[in-house]
Amino acid sequence: MKFVKVFLAAVTFITASVSPAFADAKVEILGASYGGSGCPNESASVSVSPDGQELTILFDKFAAIGNVSAQRRKSCNLSIPIKLPQGFQISLYDADYRGYVAPATTGRLRAEYFFAGNRGPVFSRTFRGETDYNVRDSLATVANVWSACGDSVNMRVNAAMTASGTGMATVDSIDLAHRGLVYHIKYRTCR
């Protein structure tokens, strides 16, 4: 019984000494800038969740057209500034993509994730139309890519859709409530 009391006291002390750092730590996504043939200026809507943990980007023009050579590949490069508490670093946890591929069309979605100055994992998927797709790139299971320690970092995502066939392939959902991309993050103390 004495061991249990000592153990519980130790756990309480450790929790009390560690929790304030995490309770006060606030990772804040500051928004996103974008550019590319699939997301020209003012063609996307950027939204950050109230808790600053999720970023949603809705695209209006991220559509590749298979039978128009100049439109076969569309790309979008994202720059996501994130404010970190001193002594923390972050990792991209997962990314959700939604879109549509027309009949008689094949769409290839490719995305690379990294922090400025580094390389990261690349995901590639092929969809055969007609289909609505909803996929997740689970980065935590294939890569452990962490930012540098500091007050702020710049997360980068380079996404591209290539279409072949007679129709279009989009990164933009027909689902009226949840469209585009959603990024989730995780964070830890610096190592």
Give short role names for the model-derived ranges.
Residues V122-V153:
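Short, surface-exposed tryptophan/glycine-enriched loops
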Residues F13-A21:
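C-terminal segment of classical bacterial N-terminal signal peptides
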Residues F22-G66:
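N-terminal leader/pro-regions and domain N-caps
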Residues A163-R191:
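Proprotein-processing/basic-patch segments
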Residues A63-I65, V157-G167:
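Short beta-strand-plus-loop segments that form exposed binding edges in beta-rich domains
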Residues Q89-A102:
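A short beta-strand element within beta-rich, extracytoplasmic domains
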Residues T105-R119, V171-D172:
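Short, surface-exposed beta-strand/strand-loop-strand elements in extracellular ectodomains
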Residues I65-R73, P81-I90:
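Short, solvent-exposed beta-strand/turn "edge" segments of beta-rich domains on protein surfaces
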